[in-house]
Amino acid sequence: MKFEYCAAIRTLGTAGDKYYQTLLSLKQQTIPPKKILVYIAEGYPLPKETIGIEQYVYVKKGMIAQRALPYKEVDTEYILLLDDDLYLAPDAVERMYNGMTNNSGDVMCANVFPNHEASFSEKLKWIFSIGTFPMKSNKWAFKIRKNGNYSYNNNPKNGIYESQSAAGACSLWKLDVFKSVHFEDEAYFDKFRYPIGEDLLLFNKAYQRGWKVLVDYNLPVQHLDAGSGHVKAVEERVIDNVAILFLIWHRTCLQSYGKICIPSYIRRILATIIISAILRFLKRGNVEILRWQIRGLKKGIVISKSEEYKSLPPFADK
């Protein structure tokens, strides 16, 4: 059967030349998309950059809202989900499809943020700041631990690995698989200014529902990193980030695996407090951060007990 797909880009229309590079990359694919669909947030003007064949659809603004869509415009078996600041080599999509089918996958992801290539000092910073650890594995690209943090393969010798999470910038899905994940049920997280971890929610939900998520370390896809250029006040950002990460742990771990996850999360919190206290003692960190982290944790706990949050459908209910 002939492989056909539609490309779906989420954007605010502000990525400029990086967005144009994304469009041009799609046009130059060895297997070009049947449609290039651009889902732009309501209230934003259409980008001036164009290749003349893309179709625009206005949708509600949000990292999840602009991804968790019914995709009524898609009339192919496969859908390529993209951010608006990528370069894809001409054979990238063809390789994604071949890798997916040859490994019996349901979704194929490009590893656009190569953690394993970071410097030793950067990896050490991730361990102490966000609890992200390197790991050795012949099977997994990323694993989600019981405390809600992820571990990454520190020495991927093979190109393609199974995964429990992935970067969301570039992924090829079977459309029916994506719809079955019901990512729209996670739109609650768009209430926050910027829902960090939304890609973890998407791919871990697919994994927990029995779908085979793959990551290819050799795909020629480059993240050009347009960014929004908008940064919240540090205090608000820290509080929100801690609250979001608590809720992601609550949703992906506690709800799915039960109380066995609680000791791991407590150890994670204690480690965060100890590290913050040490930095405060050494006067190398903002003395207010620990207080903000505690406020963020309290905020997350309060939200987890709200009727609106408790009414969300089960995370791993297939």
Please annotate each region the language model reported.
Residues 91-136:
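Conserved donor NDP-sugar-binding/catalytic core segment of glycosyltransferases
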Residues 63, 144-145, 152-173, 194-195:
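A recurrent flexible, glycine/aromatic-enriched loop bordering the glycosyltransferase active site
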Residues 166-168, 189-204:
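Acidic donor-binding loop at a coil-to-helix junction in glycosyltransferase catalytic cores
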Residues 24-33:
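Short, acidic, metal-binding catalytic loop of nucleotide-sugar glycosyltransferases
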Residues 79:
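Short aromatic/hydrophobic "clamp" motif used to bind/position activated sugar donors
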Residues 1-25:
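N-proximal low-complexity "stem/linker" segments adjacent to membrane-targeting elements
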Residues 204, 208, 212-288:
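Active-site-adjacent helix/loop segment of glycosyltransferases
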Residues 58-74:
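Glycine-rich, basic loop-to-helix element that forms the pyrophosphate-binding segment
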